[in-house]
């Protein structure tokens, strides 16, 4: 079995008399894509922010890469990458300028073009060399130039390109763990699937990925294991396939059967409500 990279034990978060997270416990293992699913207000984003050291917990124990959250929050920040929302970027700066800005915050140096090529926002070294070939067909040259967004300003990007860029910034410090909070919200179906492939590539390169999502198909496609949260509690934790099999074995049948069941059926069966994307 792979090593635990995150361990959460009896985590509680109170806001006055309201308990947003109610004593949840779970582990995340090296190299997996782990999903936190739940309706709005379930506690998934709060849980993520606590692990990211962005929000204080009320009680409970958390370790990240063997480090105690209470004792080594600064060291934990060095091994994680956190996706910012679009409001966290200067819209008038070029992508290369933004990458260099984040390098300064992390006190590290990377080649902006190499970083952007990881998320398909600029040309690879091979394509940049092809662009200099005097014999390159004009149509092919234009196609390559259109692909290169390194010199574009952030505000000029499409929604999918902005999401890919935000993921690029999480990779600058070569983190062991990447946190993605609703990474495909608002994207069209093709842009969502492109981002899924990027997330899988990042995992395949050795990172562990923690994701929150409203989309059942996304969790089913991406996640090795998921925890379903409802009203601050974990009500199920397993692989998507195992959850679906357990539901079918309980005698569940769809009213209109296309497939026997999917992950969305599991969620509605457990929580009694459909997911809301507000």
What positions do the PLM features span?
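Conserved ABC ATPase signature
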Residues: 130-135, 153-157
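ABC ATPase "signature
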Residues: 237-238
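A short, surface-exposed alpha-helical micro-motif characterized by mixed small hydrophobic
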Residues: 219-221
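Conserved catalytic motifs of ABC-family nucleotide-binding domains
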Residues: 174
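Catalytic Walker B motif of ABC-type/P-loop ATPase nucleotide-binding domains
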Residues: 178-181
């Amino acid at each position: 079995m792979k090593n635990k990279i995150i361990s959460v034990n009896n985590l509680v978060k109170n806001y006055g008399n309201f308990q947003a997270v109610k004593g949840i416990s779970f582990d995340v293992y090296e190299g997996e894509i782990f999903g936190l699913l739940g309706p709005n207000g379930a506690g998934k984003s709060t849980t993520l922010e606590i692990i990211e050291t962005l929000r204080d917990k009320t009680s409970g124990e958390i370790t990240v890469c063997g480090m105690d959250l209470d004792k080594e929050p600064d060291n934990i920040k060095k091994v994680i990458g956190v996706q910012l929302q679009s409001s966290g970027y200067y819209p008038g700066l070029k992508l290369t300028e933004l990458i260099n800005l984040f390098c300064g915050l992390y006190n590290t140096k990377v080649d902006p073009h190499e970083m952007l090529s990881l998320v398909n926002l600029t040309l690879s070294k091979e394509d940049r060399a092809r662009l200099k070939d005097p014999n390159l067909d004009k149509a092919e040259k234009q196609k390559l130039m259109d692909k290169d967004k390194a010199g574009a300003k952030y505000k000029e990007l499409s929604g999918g390109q902005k999401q890919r860029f935000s993921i690029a910034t999480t990779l600058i410090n070569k983190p062991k763990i990447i946190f993605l909070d609703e990474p495909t919200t608002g994207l069209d179906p093709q842009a969502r699937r492109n981002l899924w492939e990027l997330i899988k590539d990042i995992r395949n390169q050795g990172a562990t990925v923690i994701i929150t999502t409203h989309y059942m198909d996304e969790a089913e496609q991406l996640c090795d294991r998921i925890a379903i949260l409802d009203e601050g509690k974990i009500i199920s934790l397993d692989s998507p396939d195992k959850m679906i099999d357990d539901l079918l074995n309980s005698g569940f049948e769809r009213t209109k059967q296309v497939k026997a069941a999917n992950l969305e059926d599991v969620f509605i069966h457990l929580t009694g409500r459909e997911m809301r994307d507000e």
